[in-house]
C-alpha cells in the first residue's frame, strides 16, 4: 500500500476543502527503509518514476570504509550502531542512516551514503579513533 504525499483536504481552520481532482500516481510514496544489522544482506528493488529502479538496503552486515590517512577503502564488518545525530531513537533501535556513527572492525566510522536510497553503506573512518573496539 502506498503513502499519499499530495495535499490534504483540510484548510488551516480545520474545515474540508472542495476536492477538485483525483489523486495522481506520482503522489504515491513508500515507507522508510529502516536498514538494520543482520546475518545476511537483503536488498529490495523498487520501480520508480520513468521505469527506473531504486535499490534499498534492508539488512546488512558490512560497510565500505574509507581510511582518509591512506586513501584506501575496504569492506569491513559492522559491529554496532553507536549514535545517530538525526534521532537518538534510531540509534537505540540499531537503524543505520546517513550521518550515523558506527563501530566497525577497522574502527569508528561515519556513514556517508544513504542506505535506503543507494543500497550500500559507505563510511569514512574517524581520525584519532581508528582503533577497533
Swiss-Prot record:
What does UniProt give as GO cellular component? ribonucleoprotein complex; ribosome
The ranges of region (Disordered) come to 1-22
The UniProt entry, under InterPro entries, shows: Ribosomal_eS8, Ribosomal_eS8_CS, Ribosomal_protein_eS8_arc, Ribosomal_Se8/biogenesis_NSA2
What's any GO biological process attached to this entry?
A: translation
Q: Name one GO molecular function term.
A: structural constituent of ribosome
Keyword tags? Ribonucleoprotein, Ribosomal protein
Q: Which cysteines are joined by disulfide bonds?
A: none
The signal peptide here is: none
Q: Which domain of life is it from?
A: Archaea
| CDD domains per the UniProt record, alphabetical | Ribosomal_S8e
Complexes and interactors: Part of the 30S ribosomal subunit.
Which NCBIfam families does the record associate with it?
eS8
Q: Which family does it belong to?
A: Belongs to the eukaryotic ribosomal protein eS8 family.
Q: What is this protein called?
A: Small ribosomal subunit protein eS8
- Biological classification of the source: Archaea, Thermoproteota, Thermoprotei, Sulfolobales, Sulfolobaceae
Amino acid at each position: 500500500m502506498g503513502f499519499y504525499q499530495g495535499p490534504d483536504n483540510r484548510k488551516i481552520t480545520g474545515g474540508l476543502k472542495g476536492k477538485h481532482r483525483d489523486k495522481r500516481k506520482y503522489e504515491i510514496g513508500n515507507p522508510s527503509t529502516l536498514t538494520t544489522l543482520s546475518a545476511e544482506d537483503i536488498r529490495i528493488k523498487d520501480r520508480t518514476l520513468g521505469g527506473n529502479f531504486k535499490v534499498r538496503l534492508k539488512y546488512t552486515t558490512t560497510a565500505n570504509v574509507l581510511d582518509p590517512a591512506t586513501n584506501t577503502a575496504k569492506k569491513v564488518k559492522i559491529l554496532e550502531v553507536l549514535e545517530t545525530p538525526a534521532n537518538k531513537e534510531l540509534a537505540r533501535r540499531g537503524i543505520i542512516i546517513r550521518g550515523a556513527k558506527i563501530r566497525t572492525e577497522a574502527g569508528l566510522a561515519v556513514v556517508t551514503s544513504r542506505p535506503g536510497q543507494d543500497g550500500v553503506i559507505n563510511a569514512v573512518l574517524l581520525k584519532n579513533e581508528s582503533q577497533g573496539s
